[in-house]
Every structure is written in structure tokens, then in C-alpha cells.
Design a protein with these regions (language model features):
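Soluble catalytic regions of membrane-associated enzymes that act on cell-envelope
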Residues: 219-287
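Membrane-embedded alpha-helical bundles of multi-pass enzymes
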Residues: 2-220
């Protein structure tokens, strides 16, 4: 067998292995969202994904990203077929969201050409800021955007969630990615950006990642009531079961919630003390 054939087969095997690892990382990131809600999986999942793309050429990095993105998005938005009545929209939406990830990967691979961007801190900053930027972009475009799936959302019950009052979901998402890069660099088999004499660099990066995960817990979250009160009404319009049957008739779910809202507004018990706002549940609008 010729050397070229051996190298070609080795390259194909490496590409397949990277794609499989990307899929595992995508499923691991999915597990950080409900219903599993393992928020702590976000960081190792992203670190594993980053380890497959930060030293790969652009074509291979994009291939890994497609595997990672589709593995995360498809199970995360498995409710789409029920909502719109077709599986095609499910795959298209997952693919479009994955394309945003691909754009991010192309950008960060381009920044790796800069020598100054190869140090652990610089890489972490670039990856974190650009990830938060892509998150913000896909939350607003196309049309009104799709903010679902931000890596900030699983951190509600984690120490990193304490950053939300300071900088919103953008800061939380950036923090998750920043820590993930530090974790990835602490586990790197070889790292040309770290001088050989810095033998404690990797343990220091790992320690820094751990500290950054728990440090935001020191930020106090105020639970004091603001001046005045707000009377809130909760509306549950109900739907026919199975759910797909209700969503297959446009306007049925909205109509049910509208009738329940009118009944709530007409409740004699609320004449003297009317509510200030009525809350509808998620998925209450189907038109």
C-alpha cells in the first residue's frame, strides 16, 4: 500500500473520529438543558468540542461543528414537529442554528493565525466574546431571531447564574465559554503557546477554571421587594390531547387562552382588586 493511501485513510479515520467526538460533545451540551438539567455539563461539553476545532483546519473544524451542532439542536428542539406539523422544519431550524456555530468556528480559526491570539487567556477572551456575539446575532436574526439554546440558560441554578444581573445572558454565556477554553487548554497534550519552562501552567489553568465557576456565587442576589405590589393572574387555557392534535388547528390554543383570560377578567372576585398583568404559559400562542 502506498504512503499516500495510508495517509488518506488515516485522515478519513481522524475525520470520522472527530465527528463522533463532536456528536458526543453535542449530546453532552444538550444534557445541560431541561429535562435533564445537568448545568455542570456545559463546560466540559464545550471544552471537548473546542479541543476538536482549535487545532483543526477549517474544513475539518466545520465538519466537527456540523456534527456537534446537529447532535445538540435536534434533541433540544424536538417539539418543533408538533408545533408546526412537519419534520422538515425541525431539521431546517437545527441546521440554520448550526450554521451560526459554523460561522463562529470560521472566525475563531481565522484568529488563530494571529500569534498574540494563541495564548490561553487571549484564546479564552476571543472565543468567549465572539461566542456571545454570535448568540446575540442569532437571537435577533433572521426575522425576530431564535434565542433558544444559549449556553447561558442552563446556568440559572449554577454559581454562574449570579452573573446575569450584572451582564445578562451575554455575560453568562461568555463566562461559560471562557472557562471551557481554560479547561481545554489545561488538558492539552501539547501546547506551543505555553513555554516549556512553565511547568505549572496547565494546573494553574485548571485551578483558574474551577475558581471562576464558583466565584460568582459570592455575588449577592437581592430578593427584597421593590416599592409597591403587582397583582398577577395566571392563565391556563388547556389544549386537546394529544398536543399535536391541538396545534394542527391554527388558533385553537390561542383561542382557549383568550377565553380563559376573558373569564379571569370577568371574575367578580377581581372587581375591587383587578389584576395588573395576566401571564400565559409557554406555547400559548399558535397563530
Amino acid at each position: 500500500m502506498r504512503t499516500s493511501q495510508i495517509l488518506r485513510r488515516a485522515s478519513i479515520a481522524q475525520t470520522c473520529a472527530d465527528a463522533m467526538i463532536g456528536a458526543v460533545a453535542g449530546l453532552a451540551l444538550y444534557s445541560s438543558f431541561p429535562p435533564l438539567g445537568w448545568w455542570w455539563m456545559s463546560i466540559p461539553a464545550l471544552a471537548l468540542f473546542i479541543s476538536r476545532i482549535d487545532e483543526a483546519r477549517a474544513p475539518r473544524a466545520i465538519g466537527v461543528t456540523l456534527s456537534f451542532g446537529m447532535s445538540m439542536w435536534l434533541p433540544l428542539i424536538d417539539w418543533i414537529p408538533m408545533a408546526v406539523g412537519t419534520r422538515a422544519a425541525w431539521f431546517v431550524l437545527a441546521f440554520v442554528q448550526t450554521l451560526f456555530l459554523c460561522a463562529w468556528v470560521v472566525f475563531v480559526r481565522w484568529t488563530s493565525l494571529w500569534r498574540a491570539a494563541r495564548s490561553p487567556l487571549a484564546q479564552a477572551l476571543l472565543y468567549a466574546i465572539s461566542w456571545a456575539g454570535v448568540d446575540a446575532a442569532r437571537s435577533r436574526w433572521p426575522w425576530s431571531g431564535f434565542p433558544w439554546g444559549s449556553v447561558a440558560l442552563p446556568q440559572v441554578d449554577s454559581p454562574l447564574g449570579h452573573l446575569a444581573p450584572v451582564g445578562g445572558t451575554s455575560l453568562v454565556a461568555a463566562a461559560v465559554v471562557f472557562i471551557a477554553v481554560l479547561l481545554r487548554r489545561s488538558c492539552a497534550g501539547r501546547d506551543g503557546a505555553v513555554a516549556p519552562e512553565h511547568r505549572f501552567s496547565r494546573p494553574l489553568l485548571a485551578l483558574s477554571a474551577c475558581v471562576l465557576v464558583v466565584a460568582p456565587a459570592a455575588i449577592p442576589l437581592s430578593n427584597e421587594a421593590e416599592a409597591g405590589t403587582v397583582r398577577v393572574g395566571v392563565v391556563q387555557g388547556d389544549i386537546a390531547l394529544p398536543g399535536a392534535q391541538a396545534y394542527s388547528h391554527p388558533g385553537e390554543v390561542t383561542g382557549n387562552n383568550l377565553r380563559a383570560s376573558r373569564a379571569l377578567a370577568a371574575d367578580p372576585a377581581l372587581v375591587d382588586k383587578p389584576i395588573d398583568v395576566a401571564l400565559w404559559g409557554e406555547g400559548s400562542v399558535d397563530r
